[in-house]
From Swiss-Prot:
Keyword Cell inner membrane carried by entry: no
Residue sites binding ATP per the record: K258
Span(s) of short sequence motif 'HIGH' region: 11-21
Protein name, as recorded: Glutamate--tRNA ligase
Stored InterPro entries: aa-tRNA-synth_I_cd-bd, aa-tRNA-synth_I_codon-bd_sub2, aa-tRNA-synth_I_CS, aa_tRNA-synth_I_cd-bd_sf, Glu-tRNA-ligase_bac/mito, Glu/Gln-tRNA-synth, Glu/Gln-tRNA-synth_Ib_cat-dom, GluQ/Sye
Subunit structure: Monomer.
Organism: Streptococcus pneumoniae serotype 19F (strain G54)
Amino acid sequence: MSKDIRVRYAPSPTGLLHIGNARTALFNYLYARHHGGTFLIRIEDTDRKRHVEDGERSQLENLRWLGMDWDESPESHENYRQSERLDLYQKYIDQLLAEGKAYKSYVTEEELAAERERQEVAGETPRYINEYLGMSEEEKAAYIAEREAAGIIPTVRLAVNESGIYKWHDMVKGDIEFEGGNIGGDWVIQKKDGYPTYNFAVVIDDHDMQISHVIRGDDHIANTPKQLMVYEALGWEAPEFGHMTLIINSETGKKLSKRDTNTLQFIEDYRKKGYLPEAVFNFIALLGWNPGGEDEIFSREELIKLFDENRLSKSPAAFDQKKLDWMSNDYIKNADLETIFEMAKPFLEEAGRLTDKAEKLVELYKPQMKSVDEIIPLTDLFFSDFPELTEAEREVMTGETVPTVLEAFKAKLEAMTDDEFVTENIFPQIKAVQKETGIKGKNLFMPIRIAVSGEMHGPELPDTIFLLGREKSIQHIENMLKEISK
């Protein structure tokens, strides 16, 4: 590429890092790293009403957890928060006012609301009507004096070129254009409190920080013509724009909503549940982009190498919680035991299960886990007297030969000495029950598994029985025999 790549992720510190914002950050990160460019973070905190205490720290902490790093940010550079750049915004506000490209607007919220209501009743498209329309210079001066005498604080509006055409070649969606007359009239670039509006400040920031490419969600498409107006008014070259498609819920087919309880939507949720960051990073990278081929598991380094902005999807990206869980399970299975055990320790400790067998339990159930917090429900059988059964499990235990199998296997366990009770000796005892009773296959193994573990599926049965212990295994079988004899 001919020009230096400089991209940014510019969150508002209004709460936790959402999966959609994480995707925006991640695609900018991959784009910069792939092209040897600069990835920076800027905090857009001009909306003081939505500001959340500690929101900035939370955003950066969760980005780091995902595995991203950056070259410039408020941590290392001055004036990378919009609230620290008010003088710069004012400089360009004053310039536009002096050049007649912007003006002070004294219309009140009540007047704006009344005009919107009139337009709605008349079936007109809502838009701001210039309050100075038809006024002479003397009338305009008198109007301003009257408003200021009444204590009305003005906003500043950009004078829109109604006949202008604002177009760009979008990196994702191709050619897009808007007519200046369809923007809604002259729009506010500075609020009454002196803070700039988003669409003004973002242009000043992107130009000042020499941003070359703006990659963001397609909910920002409608903002782009307004931003192009500011670039035009100030005589600046605009960056390239790319608008990623929406993320939809794979089950409903609708835009992902915070009300969708079947999905975890905040990065903090994944951290707390014990997902591996590499898995979440991998999953998010494939939301609206793919490198081609059948593979879906990629390291961060592989994703950086493979990233190609030309493969960003034009179709909505489906957020599939089941796919993420499958991917997470793959990462956990292939992670080293020490890593997963360290992640499991807080969960085990809180549940009072950080015993001398804890690491063995993690090793036993690691292949089943989608998130590390699942170590608690998976190991319930080791810390309870009688496991809760599902309807399917209860149905298995109504089989005619179940009592025979359980009585025979209980007798085998009771006959074993402590020295004999080791993993490799347990399977032969099950086979001995088969030989004695003539019962085999599922009719043999399933009742033993359910009686001991309360599960129809799980780790190797001898491993489970050994970790559970001889006495507790016998106790579980006795409890099950009592239950099925009722």
